[in-house]
Amino acid sequence: GVRVEVGPSGYDQPGAEALWRRAGEVGAVICAHLQRDYLGELAALLARFPQVPVVLDHCAYPRAADGLADEAVRQTVALARFEQLVAKLTFAVTSSEREYPFADTHAQLREILAAYGPERCIWGSDFPCEHWLKKSTYAQHLAVFAEELGLGVEEKAGVLGGTALRLFFGA
């Protein structure tokens, strides 16, 4: 995949248009790394390029303290209408204001999982997470999804690998 950051001119601008067009031609996955302020621009690109698979990195960084009312959560859930969009659930630790098991993000994770289904959600580790997130080890980050959320076998299979294998490797 190609990770796309937001530049000074916004997300939906001529350079992005060319990149998305080319991604559609070659079958590349766009990994959209952006804040909540750019979700409207992302929606416009998703509408124009339905053939381009897209991963929403960190789900636009919800704020754990805002719970299910958080605007990034609400908009991420609304964007589930775009079938080519996959939610990357890395915010489980990044957005948390607590220590392991980062329970203040669990309701948000479940809400997004319910909207997209495990076939359109992927786990991300923020590897090397010990470098970026001093409050979490790789094992703890993984355990949030493997143990703490109470996901079923099929949900775990999708979120912890199956969806990524299909998306990036056609498996």
Locations of regions flagged by a protein language model:
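Mid-to-C-terminal alpha-helical segments outside catalytic/metal-binding sites
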Residues: 110-111, 115-122, 131-171
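Catalytic pocket-lining loop regions of alpha/beta-barrel enzymes
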Residues: 9-122, 131
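Divalent metal-coordination and catalytic microenvironments
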Residues: 2, 23, 58, 87, ...
